[in-house]
């Protein structure tokens, strides 16, 4: 049975494809989840993909990832990136390798988006690659944990 990673998406990411497409593109959350599932499988991993607009639910899933012995977490915390000490603490607490992802380049946007509480709890951060950032995050996570894409 393949090792599992969690791909967690935070608030408003359910609106991908329709919310500000000039910034976030036209890909939907279903497209993101399909890309993540396929990329994980190519690395011999299984992806559990979830989205919530609620901070506590995201924290519960981070804890569940530990309980289910997941080997990695990819997190797009959305707006919680800039405000949530609790998400930071959850990631630090579970001690699972994590990658922070953002569809847009947060550093080319409003100054309040330039700070991330998630970054210090993750071993890597990716932003500005569109949904391809998720693929890159999974490939980086696979390399970190010692699996790799199959040719």
Curated annotation (Swiss-Prot):
Keyword Transit peptide among record annotations: no
Residues reported in the UniProt entry to bind substrate: 76, 82, 89, 103-104, 113
GO biological process, one term: amino acid biosynthetic process
Keywords, ordered alphabetically: Amino-acid biosynthesis, Aromatic amino acid biosynthesis, Lyase
PROSITE patterns: DEHYDROQUINASE_II
Catalytic activity: 3-dehydroquinate = 3-dehydroshikimate + H2O
Family: Belongs to the type-II 3-dehydroquinase family.
Protein role: Catalyzes a trans-dehydration via an enolate intermediate.
Assembly and interaction partners: Homododecamer.
Annotated protein name in UniProt: 3-dehydroquinate dehydratase
